[in-house]
Amino acid sequence: MGAQVRLPPGEPCREGYVLSLVCPNSSQAWCEITNVSQLLASPVLYTDLNYSINNLSISANVENKYSLYVGLVLAVSSSIFIGSSFILKKKGLLQLASKGFTRAGQGGHSYLKEWLWWVGLLSMGAGEAANFAAYAFAPATLVTPLGALSVLISAILSSYFLNEHLNIHGKIGCILSILGSTVMVIHAPQEEEVTSLHEMEMKLRDPGFISFAVIITVISLVLILIVAPKKGQTNILVYISICSLIGAFSVSSVKGLGIAIKELIEWKPVYKHPLVFVLLAVLVLSVTTQINYLNKALDTFNTSLVTPIYYVFFTSMVVTCSAILFQEWYGMTAGDIIGTLSGFFTIIIGIFLLHAFKNTDITWSELTSTAKKEAVSLNVNENNYVLLENLECSAPGYNDDVTLFSRTDD
């Protein structure tokens, strides 16, 4: 009989549960609990347990750090693929328009014969797949805000390949988005709170999350059934609020399905778990609702307003849902929480500058020339003020006049 191993906190100790063990030869073993008995007190046993606990803690920390880096790479890769896909598809559509084919906006489907458009579509598919996989390795608090990088990459590539002008506001917005993303990566949660479907099920049964889900569902139904038919065409926040509220459930479902796929790769019988099918149904329903109302928002209101507002609302709801469901913030220090929020708000400002002023044609040379003109006019006004002040000081006062006339009389 080998050394006894103590399960880490949070792992269930019950018959039939499968757990992972890291072996000394850099391999991994899967063990199934077949018998549960009471622990007998023994000094030697406690020594072995402490040794095992230390080894498990070290291996768990290494695995968590590795998973975080994998999730980060997948999230950034997703943004690159998705941001590039917009440029590739737009380039393909422009080539078709230059050849005289019917445009897609006019009901044409000739883009299906354009290879560049298909490359863009495949790039978007690869980006969505990478984003899906990122949720299985990294916290949603980190993965979701990094989606702003796709907007940044699309804006930069469009200025080079589509000859679209990127003004000074857009460049500042890109810099702020990069800085905000970097800050969020530095202060992101380092450990995953949910690593198995069993843990996911326990989190979903938490009273706090159940209350949150009920409140979100009620608000969404009120917006869909009552508010949207009356105010949807005049208030931009109605459609975007529906997309954002439902989006919290879609990201949570993606997170759970990502964990299920990871366990399936590890040859665990996840298909027997009913939670997988529940998460899949919630994902399909929430994504369908999101696409429907996001299309309504884009068709009704200006895209430059819809995009930044939707990003802020959607990301805020995802971060809130992650804090309640996965409790990713509980293990973070106050400095990391402040850093994460600061990075998020910096990204918001960058996205706002990138979209809100994209039609404003202002260059850096115009700003510098305007500043020089203001400085010159300010100097002229100061010189006039000094000249008037000197004239006033040099003019004879009333007392001087009295003294002058009195001397004359003498």
UniProtKB/Swiss-Prot annotation:
Record's keyword terms, sorted: Glycoprotein, Golgi apparatus, Ion transport, Magnesium, Membrane, Transmembrane, Transmembrane helix, Transport
Membrane topology, Extracellular segments: 1-67, 136, 187-207, 255-273, 327-336
Reactions accelerated catalytically: Mg(2+)(in) = Mg(2+)(out)
One of the record's GO molecular function terms: magnesium ion transmembrane transporter activity
Any one GO BP annotation for this protein: magnesium ion transport
Spans through the membrane: 68-88, 115-135, 137-157, 166-186, 208-228, 234-254, 274-294, 306-326, 337-357
Residue intervals on the Cytoplasmic side: 89-114, 158-165, 229-233, 295-305, 358-410
Pfam families: Mg_trans_NIPA (PF05653)
Similarity section: Belongs to the NIPA family.
Function: Acts as a Mg(2+) transporter. Can also transport other divalent cations such as Fe(2+), Sr(2+), Ba(2+), Mn(2+), Cu(2+) and Co(2+) but to a much less extent than Mg(2+).
Protein known as: Magnesium transporter NIPA3
Native species: Homo sapiens
Gene name in the database record: NIPAL1
